[in-house]
Every structure is written in structure tokens, then in C-alpha cells.
From Swiss-Prot:
Keywords: 2Fe-2S, Amino-acid biosynthesis, Branched-chain amino acid biosynthesis, Iron, Iron-sulfur, Lyase, Magnesium, Metal-binding. Coiled coil: none annotated. This is Dihydroxy-acid dehydratase. Mg(2+) binds at residues 78, 120-121. PANTHER family: D-XYLONATE DEHYDRATASE, D-XYLONATE DEHYDRATASE YAGF-RELATED. Its EC number is 4.2.1.9. The modification N6-carboxylysine is found at residue 121. It comes from Clostridium pasteurianum. [2Fe-2S] cluster binds at residues 119, 191. Homodimer. GO terms for cellular component: cytosol. Pathway: Amino-acid biosynthesis; L-isoleucine biosynthesis; L-isoleucine from 2-oxobutanoate: step 3/4; Amino-acid biosynthesis; L-valine biosynthesis; L-valine from pyruvate: step 3/4. The gene is ilvD. Its cofactor is [2Fe-2S] cluster; Mg(2+).
């Protein structure tokens, strides 16, 4: 196993001592070491449930005979950061996310990795890292937010943006805007709609980096946790089979993703992210 380079042999006794400081026992030294990259935070609605998703992944890894270890990375909420100076930090965060996941996974010789993102730049950033690392990898996101219900009408975040203009134009009262503001985003999860997060989560399935329904099971459904547990089990299977992203992310896979992108009406930001992911495996999309 790849992790043997950090755990096996006489010269790795100090390394094993540090693993044992983490609570590892000798039996765990013989099992696949699975990293779990999480962008859990309390500032992004799409990420506030990721701790639950991570726990389900860990359970699945254990069930399949692996040893899970979690670590965190950053994330930016495009919705909160837009329309002020904060938006200038969003796209650069994608590169930092990819770099940070690569660094942790490489420095600690993980045998495989589970990527737990959810929002706009985090999903492609983690997929870029998976492609760059080329170790067995699987994506399981936090899932989309449920639609809101405002006075019996389905609503979402885009409706709140539109309502701001309606108030300025005199077509809506501030009281009506307040009611919409309070009801349009009713749960955790990536913003409801085919924005970048949901687009890239759907495309993660098409590219072959995620299990079916990763892009569509709502964040608040228990089915999301079941998928996370299954993903944890699957990564151990991928490690045993030696199935890495370079064997999955073919030119045909990217063409399929572009086709699905157009069929679903995905975010135009996919034009930024698909070529970046492809570049990590030496494929040019022009």
C-alpha cells in the first residue's frame, strides 16, 4: 500500500509512534489509510452539515476495513462574498483548496481519499486535487438546499436578488421582501438552483468521481447520509482495485460532462472548472 512508506519497516518506528499518539493500534497499521477532506464550516449554509456527512463516510470506511482520518480545508460562500470586496477571493480559493488537499494527502501517504465539499469553488477545487494526486478518490457532497415556500409559492435565493430590484422599482414593499428573505433559504445545503455548486456536484457523477445521486439528494435527507456511508465503503474497494482518477477522467468522460452540462442547463462557471480539472490529467478542453 502507498501508506506503507510512512508506516512499515524498522526506520518507520518513530512514524508509528506518532500514529499511536493518535490512538492507532497495530492492527490499523495493516489497513488502508483513507483521508477524508472536509470543508465543514459555520459560515457557509452548504457546509454546515458536512460534519454529519463526514461521520457517515468514516462509518463506511470502517465497515469496509479501512482506517479513516479527517482533515479540513477552506471554503468561500459566493452568495455571502458577492457584491463587495470579498468576491475577489472566491476563485483564488479554488487553487488553495486543491493545493491544500494535495499537500495533506501527499505528506501523509494516504492510500485513498474521500472528498467532502459542497459549494461553488470547493467542489472543483477538490476534484482538481483528486486528479492531481491520482490516488483512489471519491466525491460525496453535502447536497442541495430545499426550495423555500413564500406565501404558498416556491422560492429560492435568485428570487431574493430579483426582489431587491423589485423594491427599488416600487413593485414590491420592504415587508414583502422581508418575508421572502426569511423563507427563501429554509435549510442547509448548496443554494437551490442550477448554480455552480449543484452543477459541479451533478457533473462529478458524470465524470465518474461520485456515486449516482450525489448531485441531487437534498442535504436534509437521510438518504444523503446513506450515500456517504456507501461512499466510505466504496473508497476502500477502489483502493483494493487500484482504480485511480487517471483511469476514469478520460477525454470521453469530459465530453460526456460537457454534454450533460448543456442538457441540464448548468452554470456557465463550469467553463472555468471543467478545463481546470481536465488540465490536471493532461487533457485540453478548448
Amino acid at each position: 500500500m502507498r501508506s506503507d512508506s510512512a508506516r512499515k519497516g524498522l526506520e518507520k518506528a518513530p512514524h508509528r509512534s506518532l500514529f499511536k499518539a493518535l490512538g492507532f493500534i497495530d492492527e490499523e497499521m495493516e489497513r488502508p489509510l483513507i483521508g477524508i477532506a472536509s470543508s465543514y464550516s459555520e459560515i457557509i449554509p452548504g457546509h454546515m452539515n458536512l460534519d454529519k456527512v463526514v461521520q457517515a463516510v468514516k462509518d463506511g470506511v470502517r465497515m469496509a476495513g479501512g482506517v479513516p482520518v479527517t482533515f479540513g480545508t477552506i471554503g468561500v460562500c459566493d452568495g455571502i462574498s458577492m457584491n463587495h470586496k470579498g468576491m475577489s477571493y472566491s476563485l483564488p480559493s479554488r487553487q488553495l483548496i486543491a493545493d491544500s488537499v494535495e499537500i495533506v494527502a501527499s505528506a501523509h501517504a494516504f492510500d485513498g481519499i474521500v472528498l467532502v465539499p459542497n459549494c461553488d469553488k470547493v467542489v472543483p477545487g477538490m476534484m482538481m486535487a483528486a486528479a492531481r494526486l491520482d490516488i483512489p478518490a471519491i466525491v460525496i457532497s453535502g447536497g442541495p438546499m430545499l426550495a423555500g415556500n413564500t406565501c404558498g409559492k416556491a422560492t429560492d435565493l435568485s428570487g431574493v436578488f430579483e426582489a431587491v430590484g423589485a423594491v427599488k422599482a416600487g413593485n414590491m414593499t420592504e415587508e414583502e421582501l422581508s418575508e421572502l428573505e426569511n423563507t427563501a433559504c429554509p435549510t442547509c445545503g448548496s443554494c437551490s438552483g442550477m448554480y455552480t455548486a449543484n452543477s459541479m456536484n451533478c457533473l462529478s457523477e458524470v465524470l465518474g468521481l461520485a456515486l449516482p445521486y450525489n448531485g441531487t439528494i437534498p442535504a436534509v435527507y437521510s438518504e444523503r447520509l446513506r450515500l456517504a456511508k456507501t461512499s466510505g465503503m466504496k473508497i476502500v474497494d477502489l483502493v483494493k482495485k487500484g482504480l485511480t482518477p487517471s483511469k476514469i477522467l478520460t477525454e470521453e468522460a469530459f465530453m460526456n460532462a460537457i454534454t450533460a452540462d448543456m442538457a441540464l442547463g448548468c452554470s456557465t462557471n463550469s467553463l472555468l472548472h471543467l478545463p481546470a480539472i481536465a488540465n490536471e490529467v493532461g487533457i485540453t478542453i478548448d
